[in-house]
């Protein structure tokens, strides 16, 4: 299954965010193959636990968006690109609404 990211508020998962491709979504995924391990240019994504949970808060979102934008330049059209776009949308929402992103590994 890989890593899935959910948006949480007060410990509850939020659903039905606007999808960049139209419609709505409630989680982001399909991009874990692109997550660089041990790369100092990706300090937040590099710390995501592929087997457990990693929580990031609103103060992390500016840096996370920068890292996602770098990965978007590497991603090919398809599921990985869509997953990164959804993650970016979630990070933008988290930064303004004071939520939390939860990365859930296998």
Task: Identify what each model region corresponds to.
Residues 1-106:
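Acidic (Asp/Glu-rich) sequence patches and key acidic residues
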